[in-house]
Amino acid sequence: MGNDTLEKRYRKLYTSVIFQALMDLTKLNTSITDTSVSVTRGNAHAWFFTTSGQTADDFEEVCDNAGLDPVFVRDFAYSVVHEKGNKNVKKRIIRFFE
């Protein structure tokens, strides 16, 4: 962290929250009985795509604190969820934050 200002540190923190939510959103089930992955993915989906209420407010606040436009982030999340074949999704998510 060295020379990072407090603002930059917070921005990294909030960016990491979005990054993790995108990773959760694109998780694949490891077995038929693995409900924790489905629950995690469902929670991430609700966080990205709920457009009213506290969940939507939280999403927008996290995006604002990360310095990212919530509409842009939501559109990106939509695109990775609906991408055919999950092969390069993780790479797209990583590139999104570069």
What are these language model-derived features?
Residues 1-98:
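Charged interaction scaffolds used for protein-protein
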